[in-house]
Amino acid sequence: DRVCYVNDVSLEGSRLVQTIIYDGNEITGPSDWVVDRKQNRIYLYCTIGKMRMLKAFHLPRLNDSDENGEVHLKAEDSLASIPLCAIAIPRGSLLKGHYAYLPDGLPSRERRLHIVDIVSCQKVANFDLNHIPYEPEGVASRGGKLYLSFHTPRDVRANMVYRFKVEPVK
């Protein structure tokens, strides 16, 4: 299933408040979801045929849910499909401005951070992460810097976060 679980997180705990499901059957391989709150969109980062894509949708509101707390998106609900470069495993991506920051790779393969302009659909940067011996898991930004988390084997409490200053972070 192509599912995004929406949780309400507070200091007291968390609870599932919505499940977003993509009902299209053209997607093969792994997928991930990326939220762009400023543009009120959600992107499905997926593979269609042999092409990695970002499929844009309006970000569902909580009251868009059915009686089961679900929102079902269909192919015809897509606002745009943005072709991406060859990226092995979609995960933990970030949209900021009109850029998608896409970590990629495993210790047994190449590890990179791809930056794609989602307006022009062009790759604008490709950062080599092979000097870091861990698997990139997620990316966030704050104060003009990117924070990239890496999975370390055997102990999730030992995960590493690296800080980068790269353009075009704004």
Regions found by a protein language model. Give the residues of each.
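Structural motif
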Residues: 2-8, 50-60, 108-115, 155-168
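Blade-level signature of beta-propeller repeat domains, shared across WD40, Kelch, NHL, RCC1
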Residues: 137-170
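Short coil/turn segments that connect the beta-strands within blades of beta-propeller domains
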Residues: 38-40, 97-98, 143-144
